[in-house]
Amino acid sequence: RVNGKLRELDKTLTEDSEISFITAEGNAGYKTYERSAIFLMLKAFYEVVPREKIRKIQIDFALGNGIYGELVGDIPVDEKLRDAAIPVKKRSINTDDAVELFGKHGMHDKEQLFQYRRASRVNIYSIGEFEDYFYGYMVPDTSYVKYFDLVPCHAGFLLLLPVKSDPKHVEHPAVREKLFSILHSSYRWSD
């Protein structure tokens, strides 16, 4: 935080300020880590599989310390992208340009979302050539996302993230089948 407001780590300070650091043990830090891990995972999927073969990667719901999602195919994600410390860049573009960008990338859900957006500008994040939209802050580069695992789960995958109280430890809990079934049915019903 800079003078009590959340700021991204790559912002330059131009005046004396009161600084306090956010960690993954707090809500704001954990959400930043979570968004960044999802973004890194999406980049890895698109790096491994040609874009035209991916119809959609869908992030569905939180399950314990993991995020459940689905895509067609068995796609491995390794740690090479994380270790490369690729910068996560943010740029602000016109909303109409965002509609065009996501249409070009085949991200039709986001293309439709921005057609109805009233704000004139949209923040787009990129890792290398891969671009996407996220609401909220991101880490400055991929090396910050050190602790995660990606495991198969039902028809999709579970992106396991660190336990909030111990940000260097990723648990591999057994999936509670009844809870999964309820969340999955609920998500499908609302889709």
Question: Which residues are covered by each model-predicted region?
Answer:
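Auxiliary tRNA-acceptor-end handling modules of aminoacyl-tRNA synthetases
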Residues: 3, 11-32, 44, 53-191
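Short amphipathic alpha-helix segments
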Residues: 37-50
